[in-house]
Design a protein with these regions (language model features):
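N-terminal capping/small domains of soluble enzymes
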Residues: 1-106, 115
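Residues that line or immediately flank small-molecule/substrate-binding pockets and catalytic motifs
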Residues: 112
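Conserved small/polar residues in nucleotide/adenosyl-binding loops
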Residues: 118-124
């Protein structure tokens, strides 16, 4: 049974969840989307492989998130959707959501705290 989200049909209604540090990266999310599902990247310490992560973790995380969203979309070959899981309770929540949307994420999944994102979703319009 296909599912339609924001006008895009997922022939395989599988939503891969965000799985934290080093698991839900571009390769996994892109592969799930390429099969017709929704692949999800996690914002949790996503820049840990960046060379300057120890000295500039905030910038490294946002740079890595941007790159991973863009690369996952390439790996998906136009199929499926790419989502980003952002924990509300983190200090980087708003910046992570903005970065993900600007990079082309199709959806944002929020958890770990009270949600206040209405003003951020206007970036997609």
């Amino acid at each position: 049974m296909a599912v339609t989200i924001r006008g895009k049909t997922l022939p395989l209604p599988i939503l891969q969840g965000g799985m934290g540090v080093g698991i839900s990266l571009d390769g996994l999310a892109g592969a799930v989307a390429a099969c017709g599902g929704m692949g999800t990247l996690s914002t949790a310490v996503c820049g840990f492989q960046e060379p300057d992560f120890a000295k500039r973790p905030f910038e490294a995380n946002l740079r890595a998130l941007d790159r991973q969203v863009r690369h996952a979309k390439v790996l998906a070959h136009g199929a499926g959707l790419i989502a980003v899981n952002a924990m509300v309770a983190t200090t980087q929540y708003a910046d992570s959501v903005r970065t993900a949307l600007r990079a082309g994420a199709d959806a944002i999944v929020c958890g770990a705290g009270p949600v206040s994102y209405t003003h951020l979703t206007l970036l997609t319009i």
